[in-house]
Amino acid sequence: MTDPSQVKPKHVMMMAAGTGGHVFPALAVAKQLQQHGCQVSWLATPAGMENRLLKDQNIPIYQIDIQGVRGNGAVRKLLAPFKILKATYSAMRYMKQLKVDAVAGFGGYVAGPGGLAARILGIPILIHEQNAVAGFTNTQLARVASKVCEAFPNTFPASAKRVTTGNPVRKEITAILSPKWRYDSREQAGQPLNILIVGGSLGAQALNERLPDALKNLNLPLNVFHQCGQKQFEETRVRYTNAPANMSVQVMPFIEDMAQAYRDADLIICRAGALTVTEVATAGVAAVFVPLPIAVDDHQTANARFLADVGAAKICQQSTMTPENLDALLKPLMNRQLLSEMAVKARQHAQPNATQHVVDLIQTL
């Protein structure tokens, strides 16, 4: 029998770059892998935000020079095959040098050459798709991956290697108490409805411009918490002037503690990025999603449908955000019992153990 103490720890190379939507889930999995005794390294791009996010995470970074080719100019497309080959060779060199046992791709330009390198070297591949519509790189890698993880059901065609895991989320979010208890407690205390508006780190201009008047026009007792981004802070604050006396408003550039914000909210109005939808479900909050209209393949609408189709959320397309439509949408939602029922449905469709599920799958490679 093999002595477990003599078994070499699995070396897993993470592949995620470009946006927080790719990097944060990969980082959650990477930290969990380390806790399980795995060696972890990270394949990154030279200018990607992953370098900053990984700075103090005790994960060695290996960079390959690669950029996206989708929708770019003719010259870049002509050069793309050569850049991909060069990046693939660099990735192969790192993987051989580090004796990588498995790779885990979470999206971004780096995952293409990294996945190709692993395929050539015979290293097993796991991919994870955060959105309800698969990105280009993951669509290609799904053909050769050993495990295909999806956050939302039926993102990929049915196969033995497809697993619906959900998106990894922060522990502070999974620790939030049940929605029924939270909503009932606020109702028993006679609190006005708490409306949370989240535009993301840069703020969402459409939400900042159109929601203040829509909420003022409801003329109901409300506590409004509006995160608008730094650049639009003053403009958004001014839009709430002359709010009804029964409406309390806090406008802020950023929210430091999103777990607390979710915990206190009766209704959240926000974009429908993959991690946002996942966090809303995990926290258990009723939602109105306003999908980003320029999102590739309209994937934010597909993300939002995951909760809208089960009665846990409403979808409001940005192009329809007229005063009349917003009034018709919001008025029926100003009912805590209804919002509580939506929040409970959201929590029922959460997958709070997604991080461990993905880690377990990587361990089987």
Swiss-Prot record:
<dbReference type="InterPro" id="IPR004276">
    <property type="entry name" value="GlycoTrans_28_N"/>
</dbReference>
<keyword id="KW-0132">Cell division</keyword>
<dbReference type="GO" id="GO:0030259">
    <property type="term" value="P:lipid glycosylation"/>
</dbReference>
<comment type="pathway">
    <text>Cell wall biogenesis; peptidoglycan biosynthesis.</text>
</comment>
<feature type="binding site">
    <location>
        <begin position="274"/>
        <end position="279"/>
    </location>
    <ligand>
        <name>UDP-N-acetyl-alpha-D-glucosamine</name>
    </ligand>
</feature>
<dbReference type="GO" id="GO:0008360">
    <property type="term" value="P:regulation of cell shape"/>
</dbReference>
<keyword id="KW-0472">Membrane</keyword>
<comment type="function">
    <text>Cell wall formation. Catalyzes the transfer of a GlcNAc subunit on undecaprenyl-pyrophosphoryl-MurNAc-pentapeptide (lipid intermediate I) to form undecaprenyl-pyrophosphoryl-MurNAc-(pentapeptide)GlcNAc (lipid intermediate II).</text>
</comment>
<dbReference type="GO" id="GO:0051991">
    <property type="term" value="F:UDP-N-acetyl-D-glucosamine:N-acetylmuramoyl-L-alanyl-D-glutamyl-meso-2,6-diaminopimelyl-D-alanyl-D-alanine-diphosphoundecaprenol 4-beta-N-acetylglucosaminlytransferase activity"/>
</dbReference>
<dbReference type="GO" id="GO:0005975">
    <property type="term" value="P:carbohydrate metabolic process"/>
</dbReference>
<keyword id="KW-0808">Transferase</keyword>
<dbReference type="GO" id="GO:0050511">
    <property type="term" value="F:undecaprenyldiphospho-muramoylpentapeptide beta-N-acetylglucosaminyltransferase activity"/>
</dbReference>
<keyword id="KW-0997">Cell inner membrane</keyword>
<dbReference type="GO" id="GO:0009252">
    <property type="term" value="P:peptidoglycan biosynthetic process"/>
</dbReference>
<feature type="binding site">
    <location>
        <position position="255"/>
    </location>
    <ligand>
        <name>UDP-N-acetyl-alpha-D-glucosamine</name>
    </ligand>
</feature>
<keyword id="KW-0328">Glycosyltransferase</keyword>
<feature type="binding site">
    <location>
        <begin position="19"/>
        <end position="21"/>
    </location>
    <ligand>
        <name>UDP-N-acetyl-alpha-D-glucosamine</name>
    </ligand>
</feature>
<keyword id="KW-0961">Cell wall biogenesis/degradation</keyword>
<dbReference type="Pfam" id="PF04101">
    <property type="entry name" value="Glyco_tran_28_C"/>
</dbReference>
<feature type="binding site">
    <location>
        <position position="131"/>
    </location>
    <ligand>
        <name>UDP-N-acetyl-alpha-D-glucosamine</name>
    </ligand>
</feature>
<keyword id="KW-0573">Peptidoglycan synthesis</keyword>
<dbReference type="Pfam" id="PF03033">
    <property type="entry name" value="Glyco_transf_28"/>
</dbReference>
<dbReference type="GO" id="GO:0071555">
    <property type="term" value="P:cell wall organization"/>
</dbReference>
<comment type="similarity">
    <text>Belongs to the glycosyltransferase 28 family. MurG subfamily.</text>
</comment>
<dbReference type="InterPro" id="IPR007235">
    <property type="entry name" value="Glyco_trans_28_C"/>
</dbReference>
<protein>
    <recommendedName>
        <fullName>UDP-N-acetylglucosamine--N-acetylmuramyl-(pentapeptide) pyrophosphoryl-undecaprenol N-acetylglucosamine transferase</fullName>
        <ecNumber>2.4.1.227</ecNumber>
    </recommendedName>
</protein>
<dbReference type="GO" id="GO:0051301">
    <property type="term" value="P:cell division"/>
</dbReference>
<keyword id="KW-0131">Cell cycle</keyword>
<dbReference type="InterPro" id="IPR006009">
    <property type="entry name" value="GlcNAc_MurG"/>
</dbReference>
<keyword id="KW-0133">Cell shape</keyword>
<keyword id="KW-1003">Cell membrane</keyword>
<feature type="binding site">
    <location>
        <position position="170"/>
    </location>
    <ligand>
        <name>UDP-N-acetyl-alpha-D-glucosamine</name>
    </ligand>
</feature>
<feature type="binding site">
    <location>
        <position position="300"/>
    </location>
    <ligand>
        <name>UDP-N-acetyl-alpha-D-glucosamine</name>
    </ligand>
</feature>
<feature type="binding site">
    <location>
        <position position="201"/>
    </location>
    <ligand>
        <name>UDP-N-acetyl-alpha-D-glucosamine</name>
    </ligand>
</feature>
<dbReference type="GO" id="GO:0005886">
    <property type="term" value="C:plasma membrane"/>
</dbReference>
